């Protein structure tokens, strides 16, 4: 091991290898914390090495100190899986073994990659490269033999918190630039691209990944290179280029789950919904497999993407079914928990139904489980926040309990708690504004009015809403800030079942321009108030029949609610106004549903001729 200031991780690492290795060798490069004190509890084989900005030099120094027949290399932020059996792995007596490294990511995610970490103690095996150091196993002079071990190494160094703490990205960039300058081979240029990708500098990443491609040939990292190149292009919204690469790559590597998953994400981001759905389903068939695979690409992540896709199509029941599968497979995945409550709310299920279903699939067995749950519910301002705080008798900050009371409709208790605070936290100012509207409380409004930085016109809008002025001016001009706040409040009022206040708020939004009116209709559709939305959309459509967003939204509402004759008219008009892929796919789905197979085939042929990256129409 090579260490420096690793007191937070080192004990876990060393405890994981007890009784599994014969000796522990630690190379310290200048620790100033309690690292060496902890290490001394496990071994006396501690050596100092002056750091020279070269991981290979430090690694080679460390393996020179080993006396055993085989060497296992770990970092301080890694630890062996409890079921690992190193002796079983080396029974075949090969020169080196590729072990799976499971890298923990933030929010409960993970990805797995293979690396040579177990190898024979031979003077001919040595490390190369300053940063992404690796053994010289590809060496025609020695003809080393290798295989795959079953040992799993867990790595925690890629969580957001750890990356920020260690400032790894900056360190990696400086070391890699020096390495690439001296030795611009496939491996180094590939890792340079990866490092820029981690730093979010996608254009630079693409330059190096493209340089690495012709040098890589049959290198084991070629599938990962292609995935990362396509991903970076996608991040820059160069979807055509990204799909060209990933679609060709899938032909060469048809069983690589990670590649399929990236392909599905790109299809989804491009708006190729049918291909996205089929690709994520293919990922589920495969499961997690491949040399480098993000955990869940063939499982919970694919289900999560399907849940997003079905939600986007307003197929809320299918979205809910998919998100349930996410939580069943990975309860620690925080975005899945958040999405569950968002989707369940749109199903118009009662709070008790939402709670019972959740507890059926989410086992609350640890303190961390309830902490994660409370964080999600607070972020959503969900009515169940107060339920779980009370059920588990959790002590939380006063602003959290005030929010919990407010969104469980205990308005007067919430007001008392807000008024007891000397300062309203910035994150809760809109909560207090909403409560002031609900309770028609101008005094409470005054607590946050100044801090919200409203101008006089904006202040007047909220005063009108609090006072429920029925004859408010019809020429009110809403700023973007006010529009966004009111749209957000409209969802909250529906969830709280404050329909009279929702109506007052809607009256103000309907005095604005078309954009907030359309957004209001989208909110109504999301919460299944379809007929109300249609009643608002029709006069909008009559006044602005060529508004593409309006035609699309009204067409989708009619299609999803089986008003198919109206859908035919609207989707064909949409095709005239915006003859792009999304319009064509909508028309195809409509013709299939009404049984007009001839028209459906014509649309399919048109898609095939124009959109070469679309797979379902080929």
Language model features with spans:
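Catalytic-site signature of metal-activated, phosphate-bearing donor transferases
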Residues: 57-63, 80-204
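Acidic helix N-cap motif at the loop->helix transition within catalytic regions
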Residues: 8-11, 33-42, 83-84
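Short, well-formed alpha-helical segments that are part of the catalytic scaffolds
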Residues: 1-23
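Conserved donor nucleotide-binding strand/loop of the catalytic core
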Residues: 37-57, 61, 65
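Short aromatic/hydrophobic "clamp" motif used to bind/position activated sugar donors
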Residues: 71
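A conserved acidic beta->alpha catalytic loop
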Residues: 16, 28-37, 51, 75
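Alpha-helical repeat scaffolds
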Residues: 207-211, 241-249, 277-282, 316-325, ...
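Residue at a conserved register position within TPR or TPR-like alpha-solenoid repeats
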Residues: 196, 233, 267, 310, ...
